[in-house]
Structure formats: C-alpha cells, structure tokens
Design a protein with these regions (language model features):
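Class I S-adenosyl-L-methionine
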Residues: 4, 13-17, 21, 37, ...
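Residues in the short beta-alpha loop(s) of Rossmann-like NAD(P)-binding domains
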Residues: 7, 121
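C-terminal target-recognition/interaction regions appended to catalytic cores
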Residues: 62, 80, 289-415
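Conserved SAM-binding loop
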Residues: 128
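Glycine/alanine-rich phosphate-binding loops at beta-alpha junctions
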Residues: 132
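Conserved SAM-binding strand-loop segment of SAM-dependent methyltransferases
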Residues: 136-141
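Short connector loops/turns at beta-strand edges and beta->alpha or beta->beta junctions
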Residues: 163-165, 379-380
C-alpha cells in the first residue's frame, strides 16, 4: 500500500530558487520573468499591492541578492500593520527548471525534502498514517512528482481521482483549465507507469458535463490510450443501502490482458438504513449548536442554496465547502436537549411537517464523527485532525459502502 497527496500545500519560492533560475538572465529577462510569474500564479491577496517594479528590485543580480521574505515583511509593515509571513509560491515549471538533469526519483526526493521543511502539518498524511498500515516511506507528498515506475506490474487495484472542485457544481467548473483539474493527467501518468491490473477513478458527476462534454471527451480519450478496457457509470450512494444522495462518476479500467469476460456494475440494493442511525448517541457538545443567525440560515428557504438536514431518512450530498471547507449538513432537534448551557444557542420555531405545527427547536451542525459515519467510516476510524479539517476529509471522501461493492465486483478479474 502507498498513498499520494495532490500537492495542495504550497511550497515557497525561496531566494536560492530564484538565484538558480535567473543566474544567466539579463536584467530585462529577469523583469519579464517576474512579470510573467506574477501574472501566471494569480497573486494572492497579500501580494496584490506589490508592483512588479518592487519585486524586480528585490531580485538584484549584481553583487548580491536580498532575501525576499524580510524585505516583503518590511514593505508591508510600512504599508499596513499586518506582516506577510510566507514567500511567494513556487510553480511546477520552476521546480522542473531547478531539478533539470535529475532523474524522476531524484526530483521526487527533492520535492519531498522541500515539503519536509515546511513548518506546517500535512493533515491528509496524519489521517492516513493514523488509520492505515502505511509509513513515511510509503507516503508521497506530491503526485505531480511521484515516480510510479518502481510499482510497475506490482499493483492489483489503484484507486484515486483528481480534485473535484474544477468540475463540481460547487466549484468554478473550469475543468482541465484549472490547475487542480490538470492533476487528472498525473493520475493517468501513474497508471501508465505502474500498469495496475485494475484502476478505479472517482469524480463528481458533473465531470461528464463540463464545457458541454468536451472535457469528458478529452479525458476519455486519455483513458482509452492507456491500454485498458474502460467501463464507467454514475452511482448514487443511496442505491447501495447508504442513506445519502451522492451521485458520483466511477470509471473502472481493466488491463487488457486480464479482461476475459464482460463486466457489470454492482446491482442496486434496497435502502434499509436511515440517516438518523449514524448520529452520535448522548449529549452533543455546545459548540455544534447554532446561534440565531445560523438557525435562521438553515430554516429560511432559499432558491440559491442547497441545504440538507438530517431529520429525513436520506440526507443530501455531503460536500466540502470550497470557501471555508465546512460541511453544510444540519439537524433540527425537538424536544429541546437538556444538556446544553451556552446562552448563545438559539431556540427558534420550526415546523417538522408532522401536523403538530411550529414548535420550539434548536439547530446544530453535524459533528465530524457523524460526517465520517455518514460517509461509511465506522467508529474505529481515528479522527486525529481538528474539526474543520475533518469536515473537509469527510466531504472529499468516497462513500465506503459504494467502494466496497465495487471492489467485490472486480475481485474475480484479479484472482
């Protein structure tokens, strides 16, 4: 077993990186390079006021260079009270320039070392290592620089996908034009290098509709070029006895030498579970209950917002909100729980539609454990990250019961 991150954490562009990149450039070339770089990365909010001239002055190629970070901090201390605490991000193109001449393995080791130097936790790695039989040597920081050749013909099933935000109704729908969408090509590259017997690719349903279907045509052509028999379908979690409306694309590739008989996706199952079965028993901490504004937000109808409540048999789709990485699933409770003490918790009026009219009720967001449960993870799954990260992990996950049914359906092709 091994795991790859999608390289979402940004590596800083260091003084040494710039020195190496621009060492043979003229001043005009340096200026043009900085201009193009600024435009390409889409400068972050805290850097928008740094004119290109200012950046150019920071990168002097004569007698000595001046480190970027202290100068930027000084600049911002003069312009505003808050100081910038990190450098500009490095691009994949810049990494390729710096590591020119290195082997694929050496390039990956270089990138891994750079990630190790970051003074921030990799929460995805924390969750993997806490829950699966995987160690540091089996963890790869950035899929873009992962060398999969060492796994050639050693993998039975490869499961993965590219970030869904590029294609999701909740995202910008830029598809393959989004840098996150282009990670699809890295997943395809890993398949080409490692040649697994079977691979499973998961993404949002909208990937087939993006740009009038053109994105999907491009992606499908790539899949077919890899030498695999391809099957795909849109599967909904509720059709596999799991109470969540979550339609997702599942594409399965069978290596041609093992595809000896037709494949059919798992048949639909009767839904016997209810969403309330996955809620935590006992008192829920006050921090999950809503104040007046939050209660009114989830109980006021809106045509522009999809809000789901766990007061029904099947909940709406859990999603990692793209702006604050927060899952928008809520529960309205009546009778009122007796355990809470926080005076900020708001008691509002709510009609459950049961004929009893409007009653006093409180609202709360789901706990991270409940979100994990509703994605199919049982209580043995360790949550070792803070709530906001746990919500994100749950919202970005594959529904476990659906994946289990898929795995069962493809095992005969391996054995």
């Amino acid at each position: 077993m091994f795991a790859c991150d999608n390289g979402e954490r940004e590596l800083p562009l260091t003084f040494g990186d710039l020195s190496q990149i621009i060492q043979d450039m003229s001043e005009k070339q340096i200026f043009d390079y900085c201009s193009n770089y600024i435009n390409k990365i889409g400068v972050k909010k805290e850097f928008r006021k740094i004119e290109i001239d200012n950046l150019f002055q920071l990168i002097q190629i004569r007698e000595k260079f001046f480190p970027l970070e202290p100068v930027i901090i000084k600049y911002y201390k003069e312009k505003r009270k808050s100081a910038v605490k990190h450098l500009l991000p490095i691009t994949q193109e810049q990494i390729n320039t710096i590591t020119d001449g290195m082997s694929t393995k050496q390039r990956e080791e270089f990138v891994n070392r750079r990630y190790a130097q970051l003074k921030e936790r990799n929460y995805v790695k924390d969750a993997y290592i806490a829950n699966y039989k995987i160690n540091d040597s089996q963890w790869h920081e950035d899929i873009r620089f992962f060398d999969a050749n060492e796994f050639n013909n050693k993998i039975d099933i490869l499961v993965g996908g590219s970030p869904c935000q590029s294609f999701s109704n909740y995202g910008k729908k830029l598809g393959l034009e989004d840098v996150r969408g282009t990670l699809f090509y890295d997943y395809a590259r890993i398949i080409k290098e490692s040649r697994p017997k079977i691979f499973i690719y998961e993404n949002v349903e909208n990937v087939t509709k993006n740009d009038g279907g053109k994105t999907w045509e491009v992606m499908f052509d790539v899949w077919q070029s890899l030498g695999y028999h391809i099957e795909w379908a849109i599967l909904d979690a509720k059709d596999y006895n799991h109470p969540q409306l979550r339609s997702r694309l599942f594409l399965i590739g069978f290596r041609e030498d093992i595809f000896t008989k037709p494949y059919t996706f798992p048949p639909k199952m009767e839904l016997t579970h209810r969403s309330t079965e996955y809620l935590e028993a006992g008192p829920i901490d006050d921090i999950y209950y809503l104040g007046k504004k939050g209660f009114e937000w989830i109980t006021t109808p809106s045509k522009n917002l999809r809000r789901s409540r766990v007061n029904q048999d099947v909940i709406g789709c859990e999603t990692a909100n793209q702006q604050d990485n927060w899952i928008g699933d809520f529960r309205v409770e009546h009778p009122l729980p007796h355990h809470y003490t926080d005076t900020r918790i708001y008691v509002g009026q709510f009609d459950f539609g049961d004929g009893n009219g409007r009653v006093d009720a409180v609202g709360r967001k789901m706990t991270p454990r409940e979100c994990m449960n509703l994605m199919g993870f049982d209580d043995t799954f360790k949550i070792v990250v803070n709530d906001s990260i746990a919500y994100r992990h749950a919202g970005n996950s594959i529904v476990v019961p659906v994946l289990k049914e898929l795995i069962k359906s493809i095992i005969p092709y391996i054995s």
